[in-house]
Amino acid sequence: MGFTEQYDVVVVGAGHAGCEAAMAAARMGLRTALYTLNVDLIAQMSCNPAVGGIAKGHLVREVDALGGIMGEVTDAVGIQFRLLNTSRGPAVWSPRAQCDKQQYRLKMREVLESEPNLKIKQAEVADLIVEDVSDPTHPERMKIARGIKLRDGRTVGALAVVITTGTFLNGLIHCGEEQYPAGRSGEPASVLLGESLKKMGLRGCRLKTGTPPRLDGRSIDWSKFAVQPGDAEPTPFSFRTKKITQKQVPCYIAHTTPETHQLIRENVHRSPMYSGQIQSTGPRYCPSIEDKIVKFPDKETHQIFLEPEGLNTYEVYVNGMSTSLPIDVQLRMVHSIVGLENAEMLRPGYAIEYDSIDPTELQRTLETKKIGSLYLGGQINGTSGYEEAACQGLMAGINAALAVKHEPPLVLDRTEAYTAILIDDLISKGTNEPYRMFTSRAEFRLHLRIDNADRRLTPHGRRVGLIKDEAWHAHLAKQQRMDELKMTLEKTRIRTSELPVELAEKFGNIDGSTVVQLLKRPESDVAAFEQIIRRVQPTFFERGDSEREFVSDIRNELKAVETEIKYAGYLDQQTKAIDRLKRSEQRVIPEWFDYASVSGLSREMCEKMQRVRPQTIGQASRIPGVTPAAVSLINVYIEIQGRKQKATT
């Protein structure tokens, strides 16, 4: 058929997933079009004006390491940076940044428009153009995507289509008793495309999410709240960011009161979630304030955070108070909090229901099983959060481009990336609630740290064409610097007199010990040895005209070296365990294996295994509800019971 326009890759939806997908395909040399309902709202932060957080920060680092753009944009517009979980081990350290909401979308648009292979188009996509085919290599696949049809009748041909529509498919907003179709507040829902996907035979379900009210900062008594400052030395998201230059501002901590809780209890019947108006499932780990009060009735107060939405606005995001209660109740609820007695509400909170596609309909490349050349990424796959969306969009865009170029797909292993864990969980087990990433979902999280995301994934980005020469050479130089520093510290022996007084008192006499030996002690850190490092390897600090421009670079690399030294033994153990796990994917589970004998295996897991009786470890890992930890336990006990069997025969 004839098309109005023709592209290699078409991306539908310009949220966080769509931006990554479109940019990836375009940077890989393909003519790409990004379609959105409103070009002025590209990469709009629909909810929290922040990027990162526990595990989410890991995802952003991985997106950056592969050649994505979320990290660089966040670094350019972040107005408060905090490294979370620093009281725990480095495996779970995670960066988070409060962003200037307006500047974020403007910067993202600037980056997208700088790519010559990418065209941004404003139009409503109404339908997919699908061709019936017979493919002997994929007998289950009888259709292939050939392009899209716009509401105005134009047709756009494409060799691959990526759909990243977020909450827009048949979106329905709820605020008290009021409900109306919308993709998010003030924007229309994508009804025609939603119905089109249903007709294609793709299984789906309705999911729900919500957002809190926004307040006018000029009407808030800031003196009543505890100040939550950012880090004095911000940790960037991008490995290519040398220094954070944006002005930094604090957030504030407030608390709900008994009056708040009583007000919610008296009006909970007016909440769509409790009146029966909303039937779909919301995010378990981001509950509404109604949910918190109902499910934790004994809790006297709940913490909330007042977060600025930007440097050029007074709008304040009330983190922790997501709600779909009626507007009059929301206003009274806000006024019941100390310091917010006179606060003016700029926007009310609301809940939104939307269509998602069952992610078990997808292959590991995020291409649909039933329709070839059709890829899905982001909330349409059942996830929640900007970061989860971005990593999926990036992978969908990469694999769509690779397919068009007839090159092998990029499929990451769950032992090398949180991105892979997210995708593997979704396609293997599906989800009936918005999926959120946690570090606890990883079997080998000490290997999946934020500091080594580039070491793990940048070679993949280079292979597919997203890491250009300058960035690649910088990456290689960094790895060489760090390797050389580790070797130098292994050879450098020092005297007690060279140590800072406090450390010398803790260590006692350490004459003749190497720096590596001392760094392995829990009470030491690399900062104490900076002067020694400057003496034995001054080139480590030589980064150009001004060392000050590379402060975060140097600090992060030193910390990464310290982590690899301090946890070397554990890392070696996990490397061996990873090798064993990869080999065991195909390991047969003997018929005689006794699940009840596995210490630490919950009754629920045991019952699932006894009922299904999987034949291999790989099959067991894909049973819905079976955790990676349970699979690891079974894997270990197969070895133990196998040795016992041999000993008795």
Swiss-Prot record:
One of the GO BP terms on file: tRNA methylation
Chief location: cytoplasm
GO MF annotations in UniProt: flavin adenine dinucleotide binding
InterPro entries named among the record's database cross-references: FAD/NAD-bd_sf, GIDA_C_N, MnmG, MnmG-rel, MnmG-rel_CS, MnmG_C, MnmG_C_subdom, MnmG_C_subdom_sf
Keywords, comma-separated and alphabetical: Cytoplasm, FAD, Flavoprotein, NAD, tRNA processing
Amino-acid positions noted as binding NAD(+) in the UniProt annotation, renumbered to this chain: 282-296
Record-level GO cellular component terms: cytosol
Entry annotated with the keyword RNA-binding: no
Subcellular location: Cytoplasm
Cofactor(s) required, per the database record: FAD
Key word NAD present: yes
Chain residues that bind FAD: 13-18, 125, 190, 379
Function: NAD-binding protein involved in the addition of a carboxymethylaminomethyl (cmnm) group at the wobble position (U34) of certain tRNAs, forming tRNA-cmnm(5)s(2)U34.
Quaternary structure (record): Homodimer. Heterotetramer of two MnmE and two MnmG subunits.
NCBIfam families (UniProt xref): mnmG_gidA (TIGR00136)
Similarity section: Belongs to the MnmG family.
Protein name: tRNA uridine 5-carboxymethylaminomethyl modification enzyme MnmG
Organism annotation: Koribacter versatilis (strain Ellin345)
